[in-house]
């Protein structure tokens, strides 16, 4: 993606300021559809500050300078990127400021890490984030050890001290680093992988939708699926027909992104809403979208009210229209998140018998009937997660098939498009069955994981682990180079590792199964209340140390109910004795804690849900997962050390690596060893 203004430093020094700011303003309007008036002063300060600083360095004339380089984080761009002869300098300039805040340091460091992770031309050179507070005390900071590649810790400076700092940085980098070809850097691909939250904000504001779709070369599958959905919806709209599409995918393949793009990202998609029964996803997306709208000038109360219709709780949507049978929804396009989790008829009847709105049919039957109240065109896009069922009473795709057949018997016709695997899957709960007007569309299956930054195969490694296939997981690990999983028996080591790696705005957090009852003995009894909107928003969106309620405080543990559908950059997975290995048995043993002892459930649904719980937990990380397994206690029958040791032995056999002391010594935020740490997070980007 091109910066708002780019040229050599010589060009920068001789181009009139008005011409540069005019180019910046036009780019601001073109990219973000908002006026740049409030930015003009900041740009003028930046230009006025940089010109004398760069003019004082004779060799700087042949450097390259980029102003306002979009980083696929809505409205957030580093002010300046300087390409010297040997290094990449990322400058964030705070006009009129006299303070270097922790938040500002995280911001500029995050920009630098984004370049390292996602820009192919930035991997072989030092990247140095510099925070310039215009009116700060004039001092050149002590120069840390600068390596020949990797992201250095942020340097603080002022406007007056900037020239001296640039000279000192250049002296060091020219000594240790190779030559940087600015033209090659400008041609190199920048392929970021936005988080779900970033993508939602961008799609809702209709910014950079094309860049999101093309973010990775391995997102071809995602692009095919998105295109297929939009083409089928366009056909149904033109024909005035009802259509329902079933989109399947492995964990982290982009189902949520497809759904959000259907609702937010297309000009002619019609009025739509995203329905989910996942309260955490509702809380986090609504709050993130609200905060973003406020940052762009909206009133918070207005933004919050608007988000109520954009992201809706499926149970409230359902109950409203069940209790108002003559009312049709205004939305012509509805995305149903995790459609396989909709309630079966028996479960719906039992769960709502004493509620204000008692149900007599399955949730799929109600949703189809509600949308069919609209005359003419309507579309439903059902997102189906493979191995994501973690609740009792989830009816699977068979309930949707039954509801569609029943609708046809009552004269309500739906055109059905489904991924091929839903027609032949072995699990009868997840098979649609025979339907009129059914077409199999291969693009509706997402089989390439894009959540994980380093490998598209991480989800398949998790599958082998949960199948009890240590040799298969180990073979896959060798093919990947290594699995993105680490092992430790030390909770403090887990926290140290997470804090050392979650630099910039990368987010870390502790996860555990809701059945991990004996982790309390390790001090992990504080569990994130997933139904509490405020607690969930603080955990996923705020930052430690500014807010101790944030995930990266590493104090409160999120369960599968809190994190399903969302993600973290780095995960500390706390593994308890609710999911264990037994000698001579390939399958995992599922246990539940009752009273004072562990019990072994026999119900197939309970067992399957617990396997899926660990699938959810093992696939939340965008980078790496550290698995903490307690040592246990010989004097406590509920924490048998042998059981925990067997878990560790199996995970080690699968390819998980031990978090040894030598590696932990490199975790603090000094530059010592950062090159080695960051080298392990290399994303092989195509050239």
Model-derived features with residue positions:
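Accessory nucleic-acid engagement/destabilization modules that flank
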Residues: 1-192
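N-terminal pre-P-loop "Q-motif" helix
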Residues: 196, 204, 211-243
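Hydrophobic anchor at the beta1->P-loop junction of P-loop NTPases
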Residues: 247
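Conserved lysine of the Walker
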Residues: 255
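Conserved helicase/translocase motor-coupling segment
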Residues: 259, 391-394, 422-567, 571-577
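Conserved RecA-like ASCE ATPase "motif II neighborhood" in helicase/translocase motors
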Residues: 302-371, 555-559
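Signature of the SF2 helicase/ATPase Hel1-core->accessory helical subdomain module
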Residues: 336-431
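C-terminal accessory regions
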Residues: 379, 553-664
